[in-house]
Amino acid sequence: MVIKAKSPAGFAEKYIIESIWNGRFPPGSILPAERELSELIGVTRTTLREVLQRLARDGWLTIQHGKPTKVNQFMETSGLHILDTLMTLDVDNATNIVEDLLAARTNISPIFMRYAFKVNKENSERTIKTVIDSCEQLVAAESWDAFLSSSPYADKIQQNVKEDNEKDEAKRQEILIAKTFNFYDYMLFQRLAFHSGNQIYGLIFNGLKKLYDRVGSFYFSNPASRELALKFYRQLLLTCESGQREQLPALIRQYGIESAMIWNEMKKQLPTNFTEDDC
């Protein structure tokens, strides 16, 4: 098992998760004692304890005072955040996970957007306009740096859009533009979900954020994807302004079909880092 990690805690977490996935510590089994496991992994017991607590919160393990730590049937106990981890573990199934994400978004968006446009019309319009204006400025800018210097949301963008230490300047620009466009795409769906008045829809997007960023940062590297998304945002705005909420299912379904066509071409040449863990 070859594990790359940036810290002892990251290494321990990956070791345990990959051991669960590969059957070394299968679901239903008991983990080795803390002392034995810390020596096996090569980390301190303090570090291991922190990792075990985190994995328990994420649904991988059950920790009970005075009893051995048990490995869970993680597909029954984990939340949406596990999907990004599964992308790194089950590489052969990665594209299916992406397609499940896109299908789920297409299926639930008409529901929460209908409510958002009804009960929170003004805020919904403001959100969509902000995303349209920012994305139009992004694609029209001479460079990502030029866009950032003129954006009123520069601080927030820098908090959410991380550099990859890419040395080739042209590639760096492409990567940052794609990540920033995805930042706005996520903003649109997540905020409209919360504008619906039902927090559950917004929290679903919160749980999907890491996977959403992984997929969107690649998907929006294609100019056709950005062009299609902007067209969709403008149609959404018109629908919200007109109050014709009954048009949402057909509009969103059509966007899902057209974006899936782009994805089906892009997935034939996935970058090598598409399923790499960033921890």
Swiss-Prot record:
Keywords: Activator, Cytoplasm, DNA-binding, Fatty acid metabolism, Lipid metabolism, Repressor, Transcription, Transcription regulation. GO terms for cellular component: cytoplasm. Residues 34-53 bind DNA. It is found in: Cytoplasm. SUPFAM superfamilies: GntR ligand-binding domain-like, Winged helix' DNA-binding domain. Pfam families: FadR_C, GntR. Its main location: cytoplasm. One of its GO terms (molecular function) is fatty-acyl-CoA binding. The keyword Transmembrane helix does not apply. GO terms for biological process: fatty acid metabolic process; regulation of fatty acid metabolic process. The keyword GTP-binding does not apply. Multifunctional regulator of fatty acid metabolism. This is Fatty acid metabolism regulator protein. The gene is fadR.
